[in-house]
Structure formats: C-alpha cells, structure tokens
A protein has these predicted regions:
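Mature extracellular/secreted ectodomains of secretory-pathway proteins
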Residues: 21-193
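Fungal secretory targeting signals
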Residues: 1-21
Length: 193
C-alpha cells in the first residue's frame, strides 16, 4: 500500500513539475510595467490558455504580439513576449502520439522583434535537445524569417519531423509542408484528399 501511494505521489509531482515549466512566461508578463493599470495581469491570465495543448498553436504568437504592443513595447514587454514565443505548449503524452503543434502561419508573429524565434517542445519528443538549442539561440539571435512560419523555421533547421504545422483560427495552413518532403500533414488522417 505504501509503495502505491509513493508511486502516485511521484506521478503527481512529475505532472505538476512539467506543467510548471510550460507556465514560465506568465510571471514575466505580470511583471511588465507598461500598458494600462491591470492590463499586464489580464493578459497574463489569458495567456495561460494559449499554452494548453488543445489551444491553437498560433494563439500564443498572437498573444506575444499583444504583450509587446499593449504593454508599451519596452524591454520588459519584449522579454515577456519572447518568453511567450519560446514557451513550451502543454501536451498530453498519451494523446495523439504527443504531437507537438507549431504555428504554420507565416504572418505570425507580426511584431518584427519576435519573428525568427522558435519554441521549446516537449523534451520527451526533443530527445536530443536540438529544438531546445534552436529555441535558445533564436531567442537571442533570431533566424531570418521573411515569408516563413515558425514551423517553416523549424523544418528548415532539420526539426520538421518533430512537429506538426498548426493553423491559426480560420487559416488552412496550406504551406506545402507535405509537398516539401514533410509528411506531417500527409501522413495523418487529417490530410485533405
């Protein structure tokens, strides 16, 4: 009985620790000094839902744009927005093969200072750490991103097999990833006939 309790407690602690890693940018958003009174806290509260696995993969990029523009565009707003772009989305390792959805909309993020930055993905998928290294380096030195989505950037850096190109709401994400040799779109039941 004691061992079952211990295993259950360890599992709960692991899940809480993983979820906590995905919530890293929230405190930075709340701490931004620009914008109207209470606006940083409101945006931070809304940003939590953008990091959930079921949320649109492009929603966090739209939120990052909002952080920068509505909270004054200062250094703290930029740092918080970069944190949102690089934040790992919460995913369910037991659902959909732990699919890592990354925005396939080349217009996002719209803020020039946020373009060319790639996100972290679940370390259970990024087993060699290449996506984490790219995210860290692109946060300080953004990649050339003209006409490219975040998914395109990852794919161009050899990481397209780790993620799926997600669409923003109302976007069909027809960015030819399947035609370019990436079968993430063509290799699943969601592909168009």
């Amino acid at each position: 009985m004691v061992s079952k309790t211990f295993i259950l407690m360890a599992a709960i602690a692991y899940v809480e620790a993983r979820f906590g890693q995905e919530q890293v940018p929230i405190a930075a958003i709340q701490a931004v000094q620009g914008g109207n009174p209470g606006e940083a806290a409101t945006i931070a509260g809304a940003a939590i839902s953008d990091l959930l696995g079921a949320a649109s993969s492009c929603a966090k990029l739209t939120r990052a744009d909002e952080i920068f523009t509505k909270l004054g565009g200062g250094a703290d707003a930029l740092a918080a927005a970069i944190g949102m772009v690089t934040a790992e989305k919460n995913t369910n390792p037991s659902a959909n093969g732990n699919a890592q959805n990354v925005c396939g909309d080349a217009s996002l993020p719209a803020t020039p200072e946020l373009r060319g930055i790639t996100p972290l993905i679940d370390p259970a998928v990024d087993v060699d750490g290449k996506a984490a290294a790219l995210s860290q380096s692109s946060a300080t030195t953004p990649l050339q991103a003209d006409g490219m989505s975040v998914f395109d950037l990852m794919s161009a850096n050899g990481l397209g097999d780790l993620a799926n190109a997600g669409a923003s709401k109302g976007n069909n994400a027809s960015n030819n990833n399947a035609a370019a040799g990436n079968n993430n779109a063509a290799g699943n039941d969601n592909a168009a006939a």
